[in-house]
Each structure stands twice: as C-alpha cells, then as structure tokens.
Amino acid sequence: MAKIRTDAPVMPPETPPRSSEVGEIDTRAPFQSVRDALSLFRQVSFSKKQPPRLSSSSSSQSQDTTTDVSDKEMQLLLAEQEMDRVKICLDGSVAAKAQALSDLDSAQRKAADLRVKLESIKHSRKCAISTKHTMNQRLEQLQSENQETESTREDYILITAELFMAKYELAELKQQFNLSVEERLAELQRAEEAECASMVNSNKIKDMSHDIAEMRDAAERLNSDAARKKEEEEQIKEESIALRETYVCKKLEAKQRLEDLKRDCDPELKKDIEELMEISTENERLQEEIKLSGELKEAKSAMQEIYDEESSYKSLVGSLTVELDGVQRENRELKGKEKERQEAEEGEWVEASRKVDEIMREAEKTRKEAEEMRMNVDELRREAAAKHMVMGEAVKQLEIVGRAVEKAKTAEKRAVEDMKVLTEKKESLTHDEPDKKIRISLKEYEELRGKHEESERMVQFKAKTVAAQLEEINESRIEGERKLEEKIKEMEELKAAIDGALRKAEIAEEAHSIVDAELRKWKPQDL
C-alpha cells in the first residue's frame, strides 16, 4: 500500500499538529465547526495580510475611516470567498471522509474476510497436516503390515518348500513302500515255499519219527528176543547142567553096574563094553557139543544181526536227528526272519503312518494358515478400500482447501487492487486538494506492508504445502495400490501353490488309506 500524506494547513487550537503519527489513517474532520473554521480563517488572513503600521500619526481620521471601511469590505469579501472555499473544502473533505470511511469499512471487511479465510486456511492446513500425519501413520502401519506380509510370504514360501520336500519324501516313501511291498511279497512267497518245505520236512519228520518208533519197537522186540534167547540159553544151560547131573548120576549108576558087570563078566567083554561105553560117551559128548555149538552159532548170528540192525537203526536215527535239527534250525531261522520282517514292516508302516500323519497335520496347518492369510488379505482389501475412501476424502478436502486458497489468493489480489485503487483515489484527492491530506505513520505503513507480504508468503507457502501434500498423498495412494496389487498377486500365487499342495496331500492321504487297507488285508493272511 502507498503512503498518503494530507497535512492540513490549519489545525484547531485544541489539536496540535502531529508530524508522524503511528496508527491507522487519520480520517478526522479538519474543523470541529464552522465557527472554528471562520476564526481560523480570520486569524490566518489577518496574519497574512496585516497592513503595515503607519509611521506617522498625523493621518487624518477620514483616511482612517475610508481605509477601515475599504479594509473591512475587502476583508469581508475575502472572508466570504474564503468561506466559500472553506465550505467547498469542507464538503470535499466530508465527501472524502465518507469515501475514506466507506473504503476503510470495505477494507476492514475485506481484511476480516481475509482473516477468516486465513483462519480457514490455517484450519485446513491443520486438517491437512493431521490428515498427512494420519496418512503417514497409516503408511507406516501399511509398511509394517507389508513387512508382516513379506515375512508371512517368506513363511509360506518355506512352508511350500517344506510341502514340496514332504511331497518328495512321500514319493520316496511310496517308492520305498512299493519296494518293501515287493520284498514282502517275495518274502511271503519264500515264506510260503519255506512253509511248504517245512510241511514236507514235518511230514518227513513224522515219517522218520514213525520209522524211528518202529525201529525202536523192532529194537525192543530184538532186545526182548535176545533176552528170551538168553533165557532160553540159560534154561538150556540149566537143562544141560541138569542133564549132566542126571548123566553123571546115570553114569555113576552105569559105572556101578559096569563094575558089577565087570565083576560078573569076562575081561574081554568087559573091555568091549568099556570101549563101547567110552565111544558112546564120546559120541554123546560130541553130539552135545555139536548141538551146543550150532545153537551158539545160531544165537551169535542172530545177535550179530540184531546188533547190525540196531547200529543201522542208530545211524539212521542219528542222520534223521541231524536232519531234523537242521530242519528245525532252518524253521527257527525262517520264523525269526519272518518275525524280523514283520517287525520291520510294522516299523516301516508305523513310520510311514507317522510321516503321513505329519504331512496331513502340516497340510491342515497350511490350510488353516491359508485361511488366515485369506482373512488377512480380505482385511487388507477392506483396509485398502477404507484407505482409498479416506484418501479420496482427503483429496476432496485438499481440493476444497486448494479452491479456498485460490479464492483467498483472488480475494487478496482483489483487496490489493482495491487498496491500490483506494490509494490512487487518495493520491488523486491529495493532488487535487493539497490542503486535505490524511496522515499515516511510517511504522503503520511498514506493518501493513509486512502483514501484506507475510500473508502473501503464508498463502504461497500454504498453497505449495497443500500441493506437495496432495502430490505426496497421491504418490502414497498409487504406491499403496501398487503394493496391494502385488500382494494380491502374490497371495493368489501362494493360494494356487497351497491348493496344489493340499491336492497332493489329499492324493497322498488316499494312497496311504489304500496302502493301509492292503496292509490290513495282508495281516490276517500272515496270521
């Protein structure tokens, strides 16, 4: 704003002149009343046009009278002219005062409007700052959620890798299980062959045991026959002893008779009889010896046959016992191997069941985590939608603030233009009427200009801040939408991977149930 100086040539006596007042524009009236104006005009006119004193006191009274009359007429004319001019000036000053007052009122109203707009801009700035702070907090929250999502994504990648490893292990387990099933079938076939061999061996053992029992019976019979023959030999010996005794008795009797006969017969006959007796005795003895030797030979041959048969039976029993021990040992080994195989198969089955259960638990855990992740994604989508709405509202508010700033700028420009027009009017009034000047202090002018520049700087700074905040919010919104789209894509990929892993786990569970059913079918057959 320009500085307007309207120093009045005359001031009322009660108001001394002020060289440079500090304050607003002086819009007071230069005169309190018409009487004051006339008195001031009279004083000024008398002071300006005071006639010189007469040097001589010898002038006549007529000249004084005419001079006084002419002076009074002149003064009266001058007073009337001055009065007219003062009236004109007074009217102009009143009109200028009214115009200045109206301009001041309009300027005050515009200043009040500018203050209100400045307050609204400040409030909008505070709202924008709070919105920016909220957006920054939300952005930090989204970044933390993004980090959590990244960590969750890494966890899901690890879980997917573990699922792939579990799938690979399950395939290996399936292959090992197929190999173990084939080995079990081969072992079952071998067990069936061994069982058939054991049945054949058991039949052989039964036959051998039957043969051994028969051999034992035959040996017992032979032993009984040998004992019987021994008894018969003893009886024969006893009978032979008895016969010998009877023979001895008869021989003694015969000898006695022979003695008697010898005494009664001649010596030749006696001699012949003795020879005959010797021959007969020798013959009997030889016959008995021959008979006994024959019986002994028969008994010895029978005993030899019995011993030979018993030794052959013993060797056969020994070989059969050795063969039976080998068969029993082989049977025990087969049973031990079958038991170990069953234990190994049961352990493998338990291990496979445990691994399948672990895989199923992991799959269930993965399914639950996938559900939680879906819920988190839905929540993120809802939050993103809410954030989008909040950002849209913030953008609308910022647009409103921008429009308000633009309106404030236009209003400020209009006020500046009005102030310039007012200044030009006052300057024109000052140039037109140099005696009518309105004073404004230098400090007031500097303060007004400083306030004006400060308001311009604040408006420009607020406009730039609002534009920067708007750009930052738009960039953060675009970045958040891009990150959300990336997260949604990653979640969709992870969901597809989890669905594939779950399908594979279901296939593995079905294979496990089939294998379990087959094992349950095989167990009664093994039993």
UniProtKB/Swiss-Prot annotation:
Region (Disordered): 1-28, 46-70
Family from the record: Belongs to the WEB family.
Origin superkingdom: Eukaryota
InterPro entries linked to this entry: Web
Compositional bias segments (type: Low complexity): 55-68
Record key words, sorted: Coiled coil
Organism: Arabidopsis thaliana (Mouse-ear cress)
Coiled coil feature spans: 95-159, 202-389, 436-513
Protein known as: Putative WEB family protein At4g17210
